[in-house]
Amino acid sequence: MGSKIFLLLGLSIAFAILISSEVAARELAETAAKTEGYNNGGGYHNGGGGYNNGGGYHNGGGGYNNGGGYHNGGGGYNNGGGYHNGGGGYNNGGGHHNGGGGYNNGGGYHGGGGSCYHYCHGRCCSAAEAKALEATTAQVKPQN
């Protein structure tokens, strides 16, 4: 009698798993159909390849605008690249966590590196040069 109970319990669990996996597969197929294409990406959660708003895993992955890579990041051209909130790219990106390499506003690992942080007359300069330039322009300004 005990073995019949275990057999029925096992069949019930298997049936429940079958139904839940079928529902999950259907929802996943609907989500993928909605997000693939040029706008809003494609792939996992708010991601996947594409042109605008990403690609990849969660809010990320490869693409042209706002995307690429893993979580909120990854490679791309604008606002993207790398791993978490960053990574390589051309504008506003690059690297690993909150930073990394790139051309504009990026570079390095955590918190930046490899970018221009101070501008003097339209070119990159050191912090000392920027401070000296600021001091000289502050002396020239008229006082009200």
From Swiss-Prot:
Highest rank taxon of the organism: Eukaryota
CC terms in the record's Gene Ontology section: membrane
Sequence repeats: 37-42, 43-48, 50-55, 56-61, 63-68, 69-74, 76-81, 82-87, 89-94, 102-107, 108-113
Keywords: Membrane, Repeat, Transmembrane, Transmembrane helix
Localisation per UniProt entry: Membrane
TM segment ranges: 5-25
Transmembrane keyword on record: yes
Region called 11 X 6 AA tandem repeats of G-Y-[NH]-N-G -G, residue ranges: 37-113
Induction: By light.
Claim: Zinc-finger is one of the keywords in the record: no
Membrane topology: Single-pass membrane protein
Family: Belongs to the GRP family.
Protein name from the UniProt record: Glycine-rich protein HC1
Organism listed in the record: Oxybasis rubra (Red goosefoot)
Organism ancestry: Eukaryota, Viridiplantae, Streptophyta, Embryophyta, Tracheophyta
